[in-house]
Amino acid sequence: MNILLSNDDGIYSPGIQKLSKKLKKFLNVQVIAPSCDKSGSSSSLTINNPLKVHKFSNGDITVYSGTPIDCVYLGINFFMKPKPDFVVSGINLGANLGDDVFYSGTVGAAMEGRYLKYSSLAISLDGNKHLDVAVEIVYKFLKFLLNNPFRKKYILNINIPDSPLKYIKGFKITKCGRKNFKNTVIKSKDSENKNIFWIGPKTNCYNESIGTDFHAIKNNYISVTPLLSNLTNNKEINSISNWFENFYKS
């Protein structure tokens, strides 16, 4: 199996470094990741500026100032030969739950893989203490997948509790929960006494109802959320069509 491995924490993050080292024991892994932290870059693609890359002696590639999506795009369309069987994004040090899927570069990289016709995994650890546990879980998952491939192409957003393995209860297939955002903007001053603004802080107020990714993680289950790359709201096409027909006739 050929794996394209990327992330949004940057190529030097222990999440991608430890995972790539483990996976290279039994898979053909091409690492191509941003040169620095690109968290929160979502599905940003660089189209107005050229991208520079560096290839390390072990074959890993970094894209200077590139986004996770740039990395996956370049990897699939240029650098990776043969083409990947799977795109893996992570391991992110910090969960990507609920509304995070709209902002996360980890999820964005997996989305880009699916846009380009490949099954993709976005993998995040709910913290940074038990990274070795997360690496072992992903290793076993991909080893099983090697002999039991999916029948369809999927995007799976996988979040792993930051706990010792013995306390993780299993897997839950989940839906995205919701964060009750506090629309907080923090105004400050820079060294030149000019206004600067911070978005945050993050809220701790979540919808943790049964069946959500938040509920699974809170109860020490691995959360697996299938995502869609097609954002069309098919259920509302007829009602919206009727509204616009009335608008056009008015």
Curated annotation (Swiss-Prot):
EC annotation from Swiss-Prot or TrEMBL: 3.1.3.5, 3.1.3.6, 3.6.1.11
UniProt enzyme class: hydrolase
Binding site for a divalent metal cation: D8, D9, S39, N92
Entry keyword set: Cytoplasm, Hydrolase, Metal-binding, Nucleotide-binding
The keyword Signal belongs to this UniProt entry's keyword annotation: no
GO CC, any one term: cytoplasm
A GO MF label: 5'-nucleotidase activity
Pfam families tied to this protein: SurE
Transmembrane feature ranges: none
Signal peptide region: none
InterPro entries reported for this sequence: SurE, SurE-like_Pase/nucleotidase, SurE-like_sf
Catalysis: reaction(s): a ribonucleoside 5'-phosphate + H2O = a ribonucleoside + phosphate; a ribonucleoside 3'-phosphate + H2O = a ribonucleoside + phosphate; [phosphate](n) + H2O = [phosphate](n-1) + phosphate + H(+)
Domain of life from the UniProt record: Bacteria
Function: Nucleotidase with a broad substrate specificity as it can dephosphorylate various ribo- and deoxyribonucleoside 5'-monophosphates and ribonucleoside 3'-monophosphates with highest affinity to 3'-AMP. Also hydrolyzes polyphosphate (exopolyphosphatase activity) with the preference for short-chain-length substrates (P20-25). Might be involved in the regulation of dNTP and NTP pools, and in the turnover of 3'-mononucleotides produced by numerous intracellular RNases (T1, T2, and F) during the degradation of various RNAs.
Record family assignment: Belongs to the SurE nucleotidase family.
Matching HAMAP family: SurE
Name of the protein in its database record: 5'/3'-nucleotidase SurE
Organism for this UniProt entry: Wigglesworthia glossinidia brevipalpis
